[in-house]
A protein has these predicted regions:
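Residue-level signature of transmembrane alpha-helical cores of multipass secondary-active transporters
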Residues: 18-19, 78-82, 94, 106, ...
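Membrane-interface helix-cap regions at the ends of transmembrane helices
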Residues: 32-35, 39, 53-70, 141-157, ...
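Juxtamembrane helix-entry segments on the extracytoplasmic side of multipass membrane proteins
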Residues: 11-16, 38-43, 47, 70-76, ...
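Specific transmembrane alpha-helical segments of multi-pass solute transporters/efflux pumps
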Residues: 25-33, 58-109, 142, 146
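Hydrophobic transmembrane alpha-helices of multi-pass small-molecule transport proteins
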Residues: 57, 79, 111, 119, ...
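Transmembrane alpha-helical segments that form core, pore/gating elements
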Residues: 57, 116-118, 122, 155-212
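Juxtamembrane helix-loop-helix junctions in multi-pass membrane proteins
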Residues: 24-54, 95, 101-103, 175-200
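Specific alpha-helical transmembrane segments that line the substrate/conduction pathway
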Residues: 44-55, 84-85, 93-132, 169
């Protein structure tokens, strides 16, 4: 493991505000999905979610004078990112929330940083494990085992499968985040990447929802 580097970890009030806002918005999706799964099928929920987001970001892209990529290779990369970072995790989480609460789903989804720390060590050159990171990962994983443990002892029922589905979704987010770096190196802005992958997700999910749901 590499020795820790000196990094400025000071956060400004603006950064804290952005973090709190993001937490509220991101956490709120679990609450609304818990309500939605009582009335709508899984693929319909996920399709509506990505379509609304895609249209909003498309509008922002147009209003700010930005353009979507025209290169076929970039779109191929965006479709792969959409699959790993949107389609798979969104579907697994919504499916899981048919059996577990929004709070538990959110807690399990918070394992993304744990998976990222571990996987980034092997696939990046600038994010190696330190002793502190490794200790944090171990503590986090012990917490996850403690959360799932009681249900798992009663057998692999739907509740356990739902929790495992959310964990697999977290793992997908990890690979999506790391792959997103490669796409950014193609010259796309964060707005372009987000808009492109959500449009691609809509193209993938809407036909599936129409056929399956």
């Amino acid at each position: 493991m590499a020795a820790p580097t000196n990094t400025n970890l000071t956060m400004t009030p603006y950064a804290w505000g952005m973090l709190v806002t993001l937490s509220i918005v991101w956490g709120g999706t679990f609450f609304f999905q818990e309500i939605a799964v009582q009335e709508l099928p899984v693929f319909t929920i996920v399709s509506i979610r990505v379509l609304i987001a895609a249209l909003l970001l498309w509008a922002v892209t147009a209003l700010t004078g930005n353009k979507l990529p025209s290169d076929a290779k970039i779109w191929a990369a965006l479709f792969l990112l959409a699959l790993v970072n949107n389609v798979v995790p969104f579907t697994l989480i919504v499916w899981g929330q048919q059996e577990i609460s929004s709070g538990l789903a959110a807690i399990l989804n918070a394992t993304v940083p744990l998976f990222t720390v571990l996987i980034a060590h092997f696939v990046t050159t600038d994010e190696k494990l330190t002793r502190a990171k490794f200790a944090g990962v171990i503590i986090g994983l012990v917490g996850v085992v403690a959360i799932i443990g009681e249900d798992a002892l009663e057998g692999i029922g739907l509740a356990v499968l739902a929790q495992l589905a959310v964990l697999v979704a977290s793992l997908a987010y990890t690979f999506g985040g790391l792959y997103g770096r490669k796409i950014q190196a193609m010259g796309l802005t964060p707005l372009g990447i987000s808009t492109g992958q959500l449009l691609a997700s809509s193209v993938i999910l809407i036909p599936v929802a129409l056929l399956v749901d």
